[in-house]
Protein backbone atom coordinates (compact mmCIF):
# COMPACT_ATOMS: atom_id res chain seq x y z
CA UNK A 1 0.00 0.00 0.00
CA UNK A 2 1.28 3.42 -0.88
CA UNK A 3 1.13 5.64 2.19
CA UNK A 4 -1.10 8.64 1.68
CA UNK A 5 -2.23 11.25 4.13
CA UNK A 6 -5.44 13.28 4.18
CA UNK A 7 -5.08 16.40 6.29
CA UNK A 8 -7.67 18.53 8.05
CA UNK A 9 -8.61 20.25 4.81
CA UNK A 10 -10.27 17.60 2.69
CA UNK A 11 -8.81 18.77 -0.59
CA UNK A 12 -5.22 19.20 0.61
CA UNK A 13 -2.38 16.68 0.87
CA UNK A 14 1.38 16.85 1.32
CA UNK A 15 3.83 14.24 0.13
CA UNK A 16 6.58 15.19 2.58
CA UNK A 17 4.65 14.04 5.63
CA UNK A 18 3.02 11.13 3.84
CA UNK A 19 6.33 9.40 3.16
CA UNK A 20 7.05 9.30 6.87
CA UNK A 21 3.92 7.44 7.80
CA UNK A 22 5.24 3.96 7.09
CA UNK A 23 8.77 4.67 8.25
CA UNK A 24 10.16 6.24 5.08
CA UNK A 25 12.22 9.35 5.76
CA UNK A 26 10.52 12.48 4.42
CA UNK A 27 12.37 14.78 2.03
CA UNK A 28 13.53 18.24 3.07
CA UNK A 29 10.53 20.56 3.15
CA UNK A 30 10.10 22.82 0.17
CA UNK A 31 10.49 26.55 0.69
CA UNK A 32 6.77 27.17 0.09
CA UNK A 33 5.80 24.83 2.94
CA UNK A 34 5.98 25.97 6.55
CA UNK A 35 8.18 24.18 9.08
CA UNK A 36 6.27 22.38 11.83
CA UNK A 37 7.00 19.31 13.99
CA UNK A 38 5.70 15.80 13.40
CA UNK A 39 6.14 12.47 15.20
CA UNK A 40 5.32 8.85 14.31
CA UNK A 41 4.96 5.52 16.14
CA UNK A 42 5.01 2.35 14.02
CA UNK A 43 3.45 -0.94 15.20
CA UNK A 44 3.58 -4.61 14.36
CA UNK A 45 1.45 -7.63 15.29
CA UNK A 46 3.12 -10.98 15.89
CA UNK A 47 1.95 -13.82 13.68
CA UNK A 48 0.07 -11.69 11.13
CA UNK A 49 -3.43 -12.27 12.56
CA UNK A 50 -6.59 -11.67 10.56
CA UNK A 51 -8.09 -8.61 12.23
CA UNK A 52 -11.83 -8.06 12.16
CA UNK A 53 -11.60 -5.16 14.60
CA UNK A 54 -8.87 -2.92 16.01
CA UNK A 55 -8.99 -0.49 18.93
CA UNK A 56 -6.56 2.40 19.41
CA UNK A 57 -6.52 5.07 22.11
CA UNK A 58 -5.48 8.71 22.41
CA UNK A 59 -5.10 10.85 25.52
CA UNK A 60 -4.17 14.46 24.83
CA UNK A 61 -2.42 15.09 28.13
CA UNK A 62 -2.13 18.89 27.85
CA UNK A 63 -4.36 20.89 25.54
CA UNK A 64 -2.16 22.88 23.11
CA UNK A 65 -4.84 25.57 22.99
CA UNK A 66 -8.14 26.05 21.22
CA UNK A 67 -6.36 28.03 18.49
CA UNK A 68 -3.88 25.19 17.87
CA UNK A 69 -3.94 23.28 14.57
CA UNK A 70 -3.03 19.74 15.61
CA UNK A 71 -4.16 16.30 14.39
CA UNK A 72 -3.66 13.11 16.45
CA UNK A 73 -4.23 10.15 14.15
CA UNK A 74 -4.25 6.36 13.83
CA UNK A 75 -3.37 5.16 10.31
CA UNK A 76 -3.98 1.61 9.07
CA UNK A 77 -4.67 -0.45 5.97
CA UNK A 78 -6.98 -3.25 4.85
CA UNK A 79 -6.33 -6.69 3.39
CA UNK A 80 -7.66 -5.30 0.10
CA UNK A 81 -7.78 -1.74 -1.19
CA UNK A 82 -6.00 1.29 0.15
CA UNK A 83 -5.45 2.90 3.51
CA UNK A 84 -7.45 4.69 6.14
CA UNK A 85 -7.09 6.61 9.35
CA UNK A 86 -9.12 8.04 12.20
CA UNK A 87 -8.37 10.54 14.91
CA UNK A 88 -9.08 13.85 16.61
CA UNK A 89 -8.24 17.43 15.75
CA UNK A 90 -7.89 20.90 17.19
CA UNK A 91 -8.83 23.22 14.35
CA UNK A 92 -7.38 26.67 14.95
CA UNK A 93 -10.39 28.14 16.73
CA UNK A 94 -13.04 26.27 14.72
CA UNK A 95 -15.03 23.37 16.11
CA UNK A 96 -12.91 20.40 17.13
CA UNK A 97 -13.43 17.23 15.15
CA UNK A 98 -13.35 13.43 15.24
CA UNK A 99 -12.92 11.79 11.84
CA UNK A 100 -12.67 8.47 9.97
CA UNK A 101 -11.39 8.52 6.38
CA UNK A 102 -10.76 5.82 3.75
CA UNK A 103 -9.04 6.22 0.39
CA UNK A 104 -10.44 5.13 -2.98
CA UNK A 105 -14.00 4.38 -1.89
CA UNK A 106 -17.32 6.01 -2.74
CA UNK A 107 -19.96 4.81 -0.25
CA UNK A 108 -20.44 5.84 3.36
CA UNK A 109 -23.21 6.12 5.95
CA UNK A 110 -23.30 8.55 8.88
CA UNK A 111 -23.44 7.23 12.43
CA UNK A 112 -24.58 8.98 15.61
CA UNK A 113 -26.67 12.14 15.56
CA UNK A 114 -24.45 15.02 14.52
CA UNK A 115 -22.11 12.94 12.36
CA UNK A 116 -21.85 13.33 8.60
CA UNK A 117 -19.97 11.74 5.70
CA UNK A 118 -18.55 13.43 2.63
CA UNK A 119 -16.27 12.70 -0.28
CA UNK A 120 -12.80 14.17 -0.63
CA UNK A 121 -10.36 14.69 -3.47
CA UNK A 122 -6.72 15.59 -3.83
CA UNK A 123 -4.06 12.87 -3.98
CA UNK A 124 -6.73 10.28 -4.76
CA UNK A 125 -10.35 10.22 -3.68
CA UNK A 126 -12.30 8.72 -0.83
CA UNK A 127 -14.88 9.16 1.89
CA UNK A 128 -14.63 10.77 5.31
CA UNK A 129 -17.13 10.48 8.19
CA UNK A 130 -16.88 13.17 10.84
CA UNK A 131 -18.35 14.61 13.99
CA UNK A 132 -17.67 17.82 15.90
CA UNK A 133 -16.76 17.20 19.53
CA UNK A 134 -15.19 19.55 22.04
CA UNK A 135 -13.03 16.76 23.44
CA UNK A 136 -11.40 17.09 26.85
CA UNK A 137 -7.65 17.01 27.51
CA UNK A 138 -6.74 14.32 30.02
CA UNK A 139 -9.59 12.03 28.95
CA UNK A 140 -8.71 8.76 27.23
CA UNK A 141 -10.57 8.26 23.95
CA UNK A 142 -10.73 4.86 22.29
CA UNK A 143 -11.10 4.57 18.52
CA UNK A 144 -12.50 1.27 17.26
CA UNK A 145 -12.85 0.15 13.65
CA UNK A 146 -14.78 -3.08 13.09
CA UNK A 147 -15.92 -5.11 10.08
CA UNK A 148 -19.71 -5.05 9.70
CA UNK A 149 -20.02 -7.39 6.71
CA UNK A 150 -20.04 -7.00 2.93
CA UNK A 151 -16.97 -4.74 3.04
CA UNK A 152 -18.45 -2.18 5.44
CA UNK A 153 -16.28 -0.96 8.32
CA UNK A 154 -17.64 1.19 11.13
CA UNK A 155 -15.75 3.58 13.42
CA UNK A 156 -16.77 4.28 17.01
CA UNK A 157 -15.12 6.69 19.47
CA UNK A 158 -15.63 6.42 23.24
CA UNK A 159 -14.66 8.74 26.09
CA UNK A 160 -13.55 6.32 28.81
CA UNK A 161 -13.81 9.03 31.48
CA UNK A 162 -17.51 9.72 30.89
CA UNK A 163 -18.69 6.57 29.13
CA UNK A 164 -20.00 8.59 26.18
CA UNK A 165 -19.75 6.83 22.82
CA UNK A 166 -20.07 8.19 19.28
CA UNK A 167 -20.33 6.32 16.00
CA UNK A 168 -18.67 8.40 13.29
CA UNK A 169 -20.02 6.34 10.42
CA UNK A 170 -19.57 3.27 8.25
CA UNK A 171 -17.57 3.17 5.02
CA UNK A 172 -17.73 0.48 2.33
CA UNK A 173 -14.41 -1.00 1.15
CA UNK A 174 -13.31 -3.95 -1.01
CA UNK A 175 -11.80 -5.53 2.13
CA UNK A 176 -12.84 -8.23 4.57
CA UNK A 177 -10.30 -7.47 7.32
CA UNK A 178 -7.89 -4.88 8.69
CA UNK A 179 -4.23 -5.40 7.83
CA UNK A 180 -1.94 -6.19 10.79
CA UNK A 181 0.95 -4.36 9.12
CA UNK A 182 1.58 -0.70 8.42
CA UNK A 183 -0.16 0.77 11.47
CA UNK A 184 1.12 4.21 12.48
CA UNK A 185 0.10 6.69 15.15
CA UNK A 186 1.14 10.23 14.33
CA UNK A 187 0.83 13.82 15.47
CA UNK A 188 0.63 16.45 12.76
CA UNK A 189 0.85 20.23 13.15
CA UNK A 190 -1.01 21.24 10.03
CA UNK A 191 0.10 24.85 10.01
CA UNK A 192 2.71 23.40 7.63
CA UNK A 193 0.34 24.80 4.96
CA UNK A 194 1.26 28.32 6.12
CA UNK A 195 4.54 29.14 4.38
CA UNK A 196 5.48 31.44 7.29
CA UNK A 197 5.07 28.80 10.00
CA UNK A 198 8.17 27.94 12.06
CA UNK A 199 9.02 25.57 14.89
CA UNK A 200 8.80 28.40 17.41
CA UNK A 201 5.26 29.48 16.46
CA UNK A 202 3.87 26.09 17.38
CA UNK A 203 2.29 25.25 20.76
CA UNK A 204 3.50 22.42 22.94
CA UNK A 205 1.44 19.23 22.95
CA UNK A 206 1.83 15.77 24.42
CA UNK A 207 -0.43 12.85 23.61
CA UNK A 208 -0.40 9.29 24.87
CA UNK A 209 -1.13 6.66 22.22
CA UNK A 210 -1.99 3.24 23.62
CA UNK A 211 -0.74 0.26 21.62
CA UNK A 212 -3.46 -1.10 19.30
CA UNK A 213 -5.39 -4.23 20.19
CA UNK A 214 -7.39 -6.45 17.86
CA UNK A 215 -10.14 -9.05 17.74
CA UNK A 216 -11.83 -7.99 20.93
CA UNK A 217 -8.55 -7.42 22.75
CA UNK A 218 -7.22 -10.94 22.20
CA UNK A 219 -4.17 -9.74 20.24
CA UNK A 220 -1.94 -6.76 21.02
CA UNK A 221 0.54 -4.90 18.84
CA UNK A 222 4.00 -3.80 19.90
CA UNK A 223 5.99 -0.70 19.01
CA UNK A 224 8.40 -1.45 16.17
CA UNK A 225 9.92 2.02 15.74
CA UNK A 226 9.43 5.74 16.28
CA UNK A 227 10.53 8.71 14.20
CA UNK A 228 10.01 12.41 13.62
CA UNK A 229 9.51 14.57 10.55
CA UNK A 230 13.27 15.04 10.17
CA UNK A 231 13.09 18.79 9.60
CA UNK A 232 14.42 21.72 11.63
CA UNK A 233 11.85 21.03 14.37
CA UNK A 234 13.19 17.52 15.06
CA UNK A 235 15.17 18.61 18.12
CA UNK A 236 11.95 19.96 19.62
CA UNK A 237 10.22 16.56 19.55
CA UNK A 238 10.48 13.53 21.81
CA UNK A 239 8.68 10.19 21.85
CA UNK A 240 8.67 8.26 25.13
CA UNK A 241 8.12 4.52 24.73
CA UNK A 242 6.69 2.13 27.32
CA UNK A 243 5.31 -1.39 27.10
CA UNK A 244 1.72 -0.30 26.50
CA UNK A 245 2.00 3.18 24.98
CA UNK A 246 4.07 5.95 23.48
CA UNK A 247 3.84 9.61 24.45
CA UNK A 248 4.55 11.97 21.57
CA UNK A 249 5.84 15.38 22.73
CA UNK A 250 6.05 18.17 20.16
CA UNK A 251 7.19 21.80 20.20
CA UNK A 252 9.11 20.96 23.36
CA UNK A 253 10.29 24.13 25.08
CA UNK A 254 7.40 26.21 23.79
CA UNK A 255 4.25 26.96 25.77
CA UNK A 256 0.74 26.04 24.76
CA UNK A 257 -1.07 28.65 22.64
CA UNK A 258 -3.35 31.05 24.45
CA UNK A 259 -4.04 34.48 25.87
CA UNK A 260 -1.64 36.75 27.71
CA UNK A 261 -3.86 38.55 30.21
CA UNK A 262 -3.07 41.72 32.10
CA UNK A 263 -4.71 44.54 34.02
CA UNK A 264 -8.52 44.39 34.34
CA UNK A 265 -8.42 40.87 32.88
CA UNK A 266 -7.82 42.24 29.40
CA UNK A 267 -5.57 40.67 26.79
CA UNK A 268 -2.32 41.46 25.06
CA UNK A 269 -3.61 42.16 21.56
CA UNK A 270 -2.36 42.91 18.05
CA UNK A 271 -4.55 45.92 17.33
CA UNK A 272 -6.77 45.33 14.31
CA UNK A 273 -5.19 42.01 13.32
CA UNK A 274 -1.87 40.23 12.87
CA UNK A 275 0.75 41.94 10.71
CA UNK A 276 4.16 43.57 10.72
CA UNK A 277 4.17 46.91 12.53
CA UNK A 278 0.78 46.48 14.20
CA UNK A 279 0.51 48.21 17.59
CA UNK A 280 0.52 45.92 20.63
CA UNK A 281 -2.35 47.03 22.84
CA UNK A 282 -4.60 46.05 25.73
CA UNK A 283 -8.04 44.88 24.64
CA UNK A 284 -10.99 42.84 25.87
CA UNK A 285 -10.24 39.16 25.38
CA UNK A 286 -11.92 37.71 22.29
CA UNK A 287 -10.12 34.43 21.64
CA UNK A 288 -9.01 35.71 18.25
CA UNK A 289 -5.84 34.83 16.38
CA UNK A 290 -4.46 38.28 17.27
CA UNK A 291 -4.52 37.25 20.95
CA UNK A 292 -3.23 33.67 20.53
CA UNK A 293 0.34 33.72 21.87
CA UNK A 294 3.06 31.10 22.26
CA UNK A 295 5.98 31.70 24.63
CA UNK A 296 8.70 30.18 22.51
CA UNK A 297 11.83 28.35 23.60
CA UNK A 298 13.95 31.09 21.97
CA UNK A 299 12.53 33.74 24.35
CA UNK A 300 10.15 35.27 21.83
CA UNK A 301 6.43 35.77 22.32
CA UNK A 302 4.68 34.76 19.11
CA UNK A 303 1.41 34.92 17.26
CA UNK A 304 0.67 32.47 14.42
CA UNK A 305 2.47 32.98 11.09
CA UNK A 306 5.82 34.04 12.57
CA UNK A 307 4.94 37.37 14.19
CA UNK A 308 6.67 38.43 17.41
CA UNK A 309 6.12 40.95 20.17
CA UNK A 310 8.94 43.48 19.73
CA UNK A 311 10.15 46.71 21.31
CA UNK A 312 10.87 49.61 18.97
CA UNK A 313 13.47 51.03 21.35
CA UNK A 314 15.01 50.61 24.79
CA UNK A 315 14.01 53.75 26.69
CA UNK A 316 11.01 54.44 28.89
CA UNK A 317 7.96 54.89 26.70
CA UNK A 318 9.38 52.95 23.76
CA UNK A 319 6.57 51.59 21.60
CA UNK A 320 5.82 47.87 21.56
CA UNK A 321 4.60 46.38 18.31
CA UNK A 322 4.01 43.11 16.53
CA UNK A 323 6.84 42.49 14.07
CA UNK A 324 7.91 39.83 11.61
CA UNK A 325 9.99 37.52 13.80
CA UNK A 326 12.68 37.31 11.09
CA UNK A 327 14.46 34.61 13.05
CA UNK A 328 17.78 33.58 11.54
CA UNK A 329 18.46 30.63 13.83
CA UNK A 330 17.64 26.97 13.18
CA UNK A 331 13.90 26.47 12.77
CA UNK A 332 13.29 30.21 12.75
CA UNK A 333 14.78 30.95 16.17
CA UNK A 334 15.05 34.63 17.04
CA UNK A 335 18.35 36.13 18.19
CA UNK A 336 17.29 39.81 18.20
CA UNK A 337 17.02 40.85 21.87
CA UNK A 338 14.30 43.39 21.02
CA UNK A 339 12.09 40.40 20.18
CA UNK A 340 12.95 38.38 23.30
CA UNK A 341 11.16 38.54 26.64
CA UNK A 342 11.75 36.99 30.05
CA UNK A 343 8.75 36.12 32.20
CA UNK A 344 9.11 36.39 35.97
CA UNK A 345 6.93 33.81 37.67
CA UNK A 346 7.21 35.71 40.95
CA UNK A 347 6.64 39.28 39.75
CA UNK A 348 4.46 38.25 36.77
CA UNK A 349 6.30 40.68 34.53
CA UNK A 350 7.42 40.43 30.91
CA UNK A 351 10.89 41.95 30.68
CA UNK A 352 12.37 42.91 27.32
CA UNK A 353 15.83 41.42 26.93
CA UNK A 354 17.28 44.38 25.01
CA UNK A 355 16.41 46.96 27.65
CA UNK A 356 15.61 45.17 30.90
CA UNK A 357 12.38 47.16 30.99
CA UNK A 358 8.87 45.81 31.49
CA UNK A 359 5.85 45.53 29.23
CA UNK A 360 3.63 48.29 30.62
CA UNK A 361 0.07 49.59 30.37
CA UNK A 362 0.84 53.34 30.47
CA UNK A 363 -0.87 55.11 33.32
CA UNK A 364 -2.85 51.98 34.11
CA UNK A 365 -5.30 52.99 31.36
CA UNK A 366 -7.38 49.88 30.67
CA UNK A 367 -9.41 51.41 27.85
CA UNK A 368 -9.63 49.04 24.88
CA UNK A 369 -6.89 49.89 22.40
CA UNK A 370 -4.42 51.39 24.87
CA UNK A 371 -1.01 51.07 23.21
CA UNK A 372 1.58 49.26 25.32
CA UNK A 373 5.08 50.57 26.02
CA UNK A 374 8.30 49.72 27.81
CA UNK A 375 8.88 51.20 31.27
CA UNK A 376 11.14 50.70 34.25
CA UNK A 377 9.90 47.69 36.19
CA UNK A 378 8.02 48.89 39.28
CA UNK A 379 5.85 45.92 40.22
CA UNK A 380 2.52 47.66 39.63
CA UNK A 381 -0.64 45.97 38.40
CA UNK A 382 -0.12 47.66 35.04
CA UNK A 383 3.01 45.53 34.53
CA UNK A 384 1.61 42.19 35.68
CA UNK A 385 0.69 39.52 33.14
CA UNK A 386 -0.49 35.91 33.07
CA UNK A 387 0.98 33.86 30.24
CA UNK A 388 0.27 30.52 28.50
CA UNK A 389 1.51 27.51 30.44
CA UNK A 390 4.70 25.58 29.77
CA UNK A 391 5.15 21.91 30.72
Feature map (PLM): residue ranges:
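Residues within well-ordered beta-strands of beta-sheet-rich folds
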Residues: 53-59, 140-146, 154-156, 310, ...
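Lectin-like carbohydrate-binding module/patch detector with strong preference for beta-trefoil
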Residues: 253-391
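Flexible glycan-contacting loops in extracellular carbohydrate-active proteins
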Residues: 170-196
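Activation corresponds to long, low-complexity, non-globular regions
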Residues: 32-53, 57-67, 186-256
Amino acid sequence: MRSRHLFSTLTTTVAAAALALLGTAPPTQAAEIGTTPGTYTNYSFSGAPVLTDVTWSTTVQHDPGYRANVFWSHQFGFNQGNGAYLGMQSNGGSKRTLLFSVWDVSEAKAGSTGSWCQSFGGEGEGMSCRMNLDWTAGHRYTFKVAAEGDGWFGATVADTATGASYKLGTIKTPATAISPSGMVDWTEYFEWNDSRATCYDQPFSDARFGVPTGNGGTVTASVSSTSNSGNACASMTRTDVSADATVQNLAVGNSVRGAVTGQAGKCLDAFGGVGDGVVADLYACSGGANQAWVRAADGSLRLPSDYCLAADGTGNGAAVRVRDCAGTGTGGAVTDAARQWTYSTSAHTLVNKASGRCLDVPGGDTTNGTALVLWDCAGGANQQWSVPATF
